[in-house]
C-alpha cells in the first residue's frame, strides 16, 4: 500500500514537474518579497530611527495604490494567455508587447497621479525626494515580466534574479546605510536593484523564449 502511494506521488510529480516547479518558484518569490524586508527592519529602525522608518513605510503604502493600478490583473490574465498560445511565437509576441506597452502607459499615468498627490498632501510634499525614489517600487514591478515567465513555466529562472537581487540589497544596505541622514539611500538601493533585475530579465526574453518586444 505504502509503495503504491509512493509510486503514485512520484508519477504525479514526474508528469507535472514543470507545473510544480513553477508553483514552488512563485511561492518562493512571494516569500522573498515579505521575508527580505523583515530581515532588514530591525537594522533600519535602529539606524534610521522609528520616525524616519515610519515615514518611509507610509510612502511605500502610498505607492501600493499605483502598484495595484499598473498590475491591473496582468499577472494572471497575461500569464494565462501566454500559457495557452506558447507554441505560437507571433501571437505571444503580440500579447507580450501589448502588455508591456499598457503597463508602461499605466506607469506613466501613475507617476503623474503620484506627483499630483505629493503636491496636494503636505505630509507627502515634505518628502518629495523620498516619494520620487520610492516610485522605483512601481517601476521595478513593471519591468519584471513575472507574467511572461509564469506563462512559460520558467519562474525558477526568475527566482534566481530575485535571490541575487535580495542578497545585493541586503549587502549594500548594511554597507552604505550608517546614519539617519542615509535614509534616501535605501530606496535607491532597494528599488534601483529591482529595476536592474527587471531589465536583465527582459533582456533574456528573446534568448530564452524567442520573443521580441515590438510596438503593437
Regions found by a protein language model. Name each.
Residues 22-32, 90, 132, 136, ...:
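Alpha-helical transmembrane segments of multi-pass membrane transporters/permeases
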Residues 1-36:
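N-terminal membrane topogenesis motif
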Residues 65, 104-108, 115-119, 123-148, ...:
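Alpha-helical transmembrane segments of multi-pass membrane proteins
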Residues 13-17, 48-52, 66-101, 150-156:
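Transmembrane-helix boundary and interhelical linker motifs in polytopic inner-membrane proteins
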Residues 128, 132-135, 159-209:
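Hydrophobic alpha-helical transmembrane segments
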Residues 41-66, 183-188:
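Interfacial/gating helices of multi-pass transporter permease domains
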Residues 35-36, 40, 57-83, 142-146, ...:
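Small-residue-rich midsections of specific transmembrane alpha-helices
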Residues 1-7, 15, 78, 144-156, ...:
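C-terminal transmembrane helix end/exit motif
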Amino acid at each position: 500500500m505504502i509503495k503504491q502511494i509512493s509510486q503514485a506521488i512520484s508519477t504525479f510529480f514526474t508528469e507535472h514537474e514543470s507545473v510544480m516547479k513553477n508553483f514552488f518558484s512563485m511561492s518562493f518569490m512571494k516569500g522573498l518579497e515579505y521575508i527580505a524586508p523583515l530581515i532588514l527592519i530591525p537594522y533600519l529602525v535602529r539606524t534610521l530611527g522609528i520616525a524616519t522608518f515610519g515615514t518611509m513605510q507610509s510612502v511605500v503604502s502610498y505607492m501600493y495604490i499605483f502598484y495595484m493600478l499598473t498590475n491591473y490583473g496582468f499577472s494572471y490574465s497575461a500569464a494565462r494567455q501566454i500559457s495557452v498560445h506558447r507554441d505560437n511565437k507571433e501571437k505571444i509576441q503580440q500579447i507580450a508587447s501589448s502588455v508591456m506597452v499598457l503597463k508602461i502607459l499605466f506607469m506613466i499615468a501613475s507617476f503623474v497621479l503620484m506627483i499630483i498627490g505629493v503636491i496636494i498632501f503636505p505630509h507627502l510634499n515634505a518628502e518629495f525626494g523620498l516619494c520620487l525614489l520610492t516610485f522605483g517600487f512601481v517601476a521595478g514591478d513593471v519591468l519584471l515580466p513575472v507574467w511572461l515567465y509564469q506563462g512559460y513555466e520558467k519562474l525558477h529562472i526568475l527566482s534566481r534574479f530575485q535571490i541575487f537581487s535580495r542578497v545585493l540589497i541586503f549587502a549594500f544596505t548594511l554597507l552604505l546605510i550608517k546614519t539617519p541622514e542615509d535614509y534616501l539611500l535605501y530606496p535607491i538601493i532597494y528599488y534601483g536593484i529591482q529595476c536592474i533585475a527587471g531589465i536583465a530579465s527582459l533582456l533574456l526574453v528573446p534568448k530564452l523564449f524567442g520573443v521580441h518586444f515590438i510596438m503593437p
